[in-house]
Amino acid sequence: MTSHENDKDRVNDQSLVGRHQSIGDDPAEGVTKPTYAAGAVLWRGDADDPEVGIIHRPSYGDWSLPKGKLDPGENLPGVAEREIREETGYTVRLGKLVGSVSYPVTGRTKLVWYWTAEVLGGEFAPNDEVDELRWVGMDEAEELLTYDLDVDVLRKARKRLSREPDTRIIYIRHGRAHSRKNWAGDDNLRPLDKKGRRQAELLISQTLPFRPERIYSAEPDRCRHTVEPLAGELGLDVTVDPLFGDMAWIGSQVEAQNRFMDVVAEGGVSVICAQGTVIPDTIAWLSANGTLPIADIPCKKGSAWVLGFNDGVLTTADYYSSALPVK
């Protein structure tokens, strides 16, 4: 076993607490010489009693959770999905952000973010990095894993899977648009600027791993244009409805709330792209009427909230402040 893997259990830091997690603009804030990585607790079957996939890495002689380093130009959900596919051959749907761990690796600090990831398809084939994958129950997985730190991640994932949401809403604020003060026409027609168009393109790799089935947008063009690249990649239409926008929230709040809950009732995974007033207000309303207190509700342009619901009640919330590359 290499020295840096020994350090993983001897010296580490964890952020694995809570049904509300977030990834900020600078995920390694305060860390010098960070190495970014992402992975997942791979699961299949019944979320209440799942089998989990544990990999064997011949180069380390260990049993661990699938993960890998981030390449330049990637965001963290995108690298988690890619690494799982490369190491295991499986297509997955990312779910709850379990949190992050960090530990020293040869003069640097390795930071690893983990999600739950449900297997949708594919087949494992031994490769240079992973020569065996075992599907085992949670208790057996704890015994099989080489590192205590991985066991801690697994236990947190087990807790989250014990109440796996039946619905997820990916609530996106539109990308950056041209300045309102320099726009003389209809504000609904104000377009994305260069950065906003880049945000829209990068939202593809951040959002695809969650496998959305429907895409909705508020009326302004900047909302629709933010999710059109994603819709094109998925082969989905963008359903535009003014009830998802700021004006509807201000003028017809109950109707806007009912429309949002209509999407929740559809189940599965949906994307809604909206604006900077309605998103935090809606989340505050959901929090007040659910089981998940959220004190601070940021809503940067190009950001996304992944909201989990059980029987129409908000139970989990993860905030991704930016789809732009981490490095």
Task: Please provide the spans of the model-predicted regions.
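Acidic, metal-coordinating catalytic segment for phosphate/diphosphate chemistry
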Residues: T2-G39
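Nudix hydrolase/Nudix homology domain
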Residues: T2-H4, G61-D62, F124-S179, W183, ...
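Conserved Nudix-box catalytic region and its N-terminal flanking loop in Nudix hydrolases
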Residues: D48-T91, W183-R190, K195
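Unchanged
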Residues: L70-R93, V101-D152
